[in-house]
Amino acid sequence: AANEEGVVTGAELIHNPDWSSGMSSSIRLACELLSVDCDQLLVLLADQVLVSTNELETLVAMAADGGSACAGFSGTVGPPAVFSRAWYPDLLTLNAENGAKKLLTDPAKQVAIVPMKSAGWDIDSKGDLERLSDVSSYIFGN
């Protein structure tokens, strides 16, 4: 839980020295550090502010028993995504050209796709941030 200063207790902050090479380097680092201790890895982007706890819980449940689950939105798939430990070796092979999306769309892999309109909304610009005030129409179609 976050305290008044915004510090999350019970969590360890990990710095990725190779951050400039892309998100795949952060996923690889997480797999290296968590492979023994964690059954699942959640990939959630900090700017996906509309994704709910219930949606994340659904992904975790759908990825149980060695599976994987990801959001489906706007005709594509992507984060948030949950990968079970069995996927860690594949995640360790990711690079800038072959990211996690390639794994999620591989027909040989079993991936549960959870419809998640909220995952399609992220904040990439000041305009995106300003549109958050009208986000209910995006999510609920009002």
Predicted regions located by residue number:
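Nucleotide and nucleotide-moiety/phosphate-recognizing core
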Residues: A1-V77, R85, K109-M116, F140
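Activation segment
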Residues: C38, S52, L91-L92, S133
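Short glycine- and hydrophobic/aromatic-rich loop-to-beta-strand nucleating segment
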Residues: P79-F83, W121-I123
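Conserved alpha/beta core of the MobA/IspD/sugar-nucleotide pyrophosphorylase nucleotidyltransferase superfamily
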Residues: T93-N142
